[in-house]
Amino acid sequence: MQFIDEARFVVRGGRGGDGAVSFHREKYRPRGGPDGGRGGDGGSVILRATEDLQTLERYSRRKVISAGRGGHGSGNNRAGERGRDVVLDVPVGTLVYDESGLLADLAEPGQTFVAARGGEGGRGNASFATSRRQAPAFRELGLPGEEREIRLELRVLSDVGLVGLPNAGKSSLLRALSAARPRVGDYPFTTLTPQLGVVEERGYARPFVVADIPGLISGASEGRGLGNRFLRHVARARLLVLVLDASEDPEGAERTLRAELGAAGLSGRPSLVVLNKVDLLDAELRAYLGEAFPGAPQVSARTGEGVGELARLLERRLRELERSAEAAPRPGHRVFRPSWRGLRVERENGAYVVSGREVERLALKTDWDNPEGVEHFQRELERRGVMGALRRAGAGEGDEVRIGDVSFEFR
């Protein structure tokens, strides 16, 4: 299976079912009271994070994913069936975008996000009966479901991200730290996809995940090499470990890594420098690097030297980061409710254009082939202040008014 970390497709919620116009019928009551039921809501397209997937490969060729349509209402106040939801499993660590920006970050197993909500079912005529209007003969149409193009971007979730130039020994270090068995070789970009390993030792507070991220080269922040695909996965690690080849200009390698992380806006991330391949150095050079990189662990992934001490150091650093995160304030939760506020009336090409979420929904729900339904629509416009807003804007008898895709004459 290919490692695909990006996918783009259209999601479409199901249309809501139409309400019914029906009257109760029984012996001696040939035209009883209204009993038309409402239409069922359309199904939604829902994304769900799971640990059972590691790639977005299953969505790489999908173009449109649609949920089910709601059933129409019927007599005896029977509501239509709800449309079938479509649940799309995605790997933990998937970010969801549309043209406006980030919509969701699915960072926990089981976390869900409604990518396209189904349309609301229309009310049947039973819902419009009042003491003054005892036999309404109109209903509402179901609303269309939401539709948008989304882009999924997978960023591997890890506690520790190993970053370094090609052949710095990251894959060997991952293998030494954990039970992971990545490919290892002496050529650029041995690792073309992120590799994960779990470090689990007796006495640790909890196991932690280490990711070997594809090798970084100068210019990655501008798209060179594996470019932004590398940086995407680095951004999710809680602690970055800069793995330097101690035998090949470690000072220059650190400068390159710091510069690329800084250009990508990642310079503020918690980090630790590790000198690898120290088994290739003599005692004098080791001492020099100890002064040039004070506090940096010196390890050899090949011989295992210093690897145990490094694992314990990483575990301590992660615990410190957890304590800092627990002390940070949490953002508040905001709830948005539909409102008739924000209604706009504008003049456009000789017509008065009315815009606003609720007034556009009302127009979509109206059955324009039913005169009673049109009268109800006009009464709602008057009651909600839309007609008053049109008059204040200068609308007069016979002027064209547009609401969404609906056009009618002002009266």
Swiss-Prot record:
GO cellular component assignments: cytoplasm
Domain of life: Bacteria
All residue ranges annotated as the OCT domain in the record: 335-411
Annotated localization: Cytoplasm
Keywords annotated in UniProt: Cytoplasm, GTP-binding, Hydrolase, Magnesium, Metal-binding, Nucleotide-binding
UniProt cross-references to Pfam families, sorted A to Z: DUF1967 (PF09269), GTP1_OBG (PF01018), MMR_HSR1 (PF01926)
Annotated coiled-coil segments of the chain: none
Alphabetized PROSITE patterns for the sequence: G_OBG, OBG, OCT
Bias kind Gly residues: ranges: 33-43
Main location: cytoplasm
Binding site for Mg(2+): 171, 191
A biological-process GO annotation: ribosome biogenesis
UniProt xrefs under SUPFAM superfamilies: Obg GTP-binding protein C-terminal domain, Obg GTP-binding protein N-terminal domain, P-loop containing nucleoside triphosphate hydrolases
UniProt similarity note: Belongs to the TRAFAC class OBG-HflX-like GTPase superfamily. OBG GTPase family.
UniProt protein name: GTPase Obg
Taxonomic source organism: Rubrobacter xylanophilus (strain DSM 9941 / JCM 11954 / NBRC 16129 / PRD-1)
